[in-house]
Amino acid sequence: MARVCQVTGKAPMSGNNVSHANNKTKRRFLPNLQSRRIWVESENRFVRLRISNAGLRLIDKNGIDSVLADLRARGEA
């Protein structure tokens, strides 16, 4: 399963760990993904999503119906 948020599309980024001596080693910055079952009142059912914390906040702000409509328009849900 890919580490990509279904709502925002956030994916892992690459960067560097930088030590005190300024030595650099490659690392990955992973999105804060959560698996959530979210109740959709209009469909009278739960929807299971793998979303980042930013995606959860987006659902709180815009509502699950609006977010699901965007997902379906993109062909993801």
From Swiss-Prot:
Superkingdom of the source species: Bacteria
UniProt cross-references to Pfam families, sorted A to Z: Ribosomal_L28
GO annotations of cellular component type: cytosolic large ribosomal subunit
Alphabetical keyword list: Ribonucleoprotein, Ribosomal protein
InterPro entries the record matches: Ribosomal_bL28 (IPR026569), Ribosomal_bL28/bL31-like_sf (IPR034704), Ribosomal_bL28_bact-type (IPR001383), Ribosomal_bL28_sf (IPR037147)
Keyword Ribonucleoprotein: yes
Gene Ontology molecular function: structural constituent of ribosome
Keyword flag Ribosomal protein: yes
Disulfide bonds, paired cysteine numbers: none
Region annotation (Disordered) ranges: 1-25
Gene Ontology biological process: translation
Protein family (similarity comment): Belongs to the bacterial ribosomal protein bL28 family.
HAMAP family, per database record: Ribosomal_bL28
Protein name: Large ribosomal subunit protein bL28
Organism classification: Bacteria, Pseudomonadati, Pseudomonadota, Betaproteobacteria, Burkholderiales
Gene: rpmB
